[in-house]
């Protein structure tokens, strides 16, 4: 399941580095970190709204937007996707059998 997310991460990183003409990711980079953060916030709100009142396919669509914009934001902040996965794994190990937060 996470193989595609790893591939997407690599594509996002490449587009950030190369900034190809016509790339949406490159456009976000050009507009800067505050823009990327706002886009992530907007997409998060859209997911919340969809979760509460829209059909299932809308929730899936908005969730994909949130994941993409999260990855772009992380990349712009210099946080590697593998670090986030590692943190989730750490939490899972720390909480296994203890009730946890997940």
From Swiss-Prot:
SUPFAM superfamilies (UniProt xref): all-alpha NTP pyrophosphatases
Pathways involved: Amino-acid biosynthesis; L-histidine biosynthesis; L-histidine from 5-phospho-alpha-D-ribose 1-diphosphate: step 2/9
Annotated GO biological process: L-histidine biosynthetic process
One MF term in the entry's GO annotations: ATP binding
EC number: 3.6.1.31
Compartments it resides in: Cytoplasm
Any single GO CC term annotated in Swiss-Prot or TrEMBL for this entry: cytoplasm
Catalytic activity entry: 1-(5-phospho-beta-D-ribosyl)-ATP + H2O = 1-(5-phospho-beta-D-ribosyl)-5'-AMP + diphosphate + H(+)
Broad class of enzyme this protein falls into: hydrolase
Record carries keyword Nucleotidyltransferase: no
Keywords noted in UniProt: Amino-acid biosynthesis, ATP-binding, Cytoplasm, Histidine biosynthesis, Hydrolase, Nucleotide-binding
Family statement: Belongs to the PRA-PH family.
Protein name (database record): Phosphoribosyl-ATP pyrophosphatase
Gene: hisE
């Amino acid at each position: 399941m996470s193989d595609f997310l790893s591939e997407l991460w690599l594509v996002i990183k490449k587009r950030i580095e190369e900034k190809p003409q016509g790339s949406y990711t490159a456009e976000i980079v050009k507009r800067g970190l505050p823009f990327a953060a706002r886009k992530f916030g907007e997409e998060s709100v859209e997911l919340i709204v969809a979760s509460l009142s829209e059909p299932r396919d809308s929730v899936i669509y908005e969730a994909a937007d949130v994941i993409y914009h999260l990855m772009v934001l992380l990349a712009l902040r210099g946080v590697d996707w593998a670090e986030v996965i590692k943190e989730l794994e750490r939490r899972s190990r720390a909480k296994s059998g203890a009730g946890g937060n997940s």
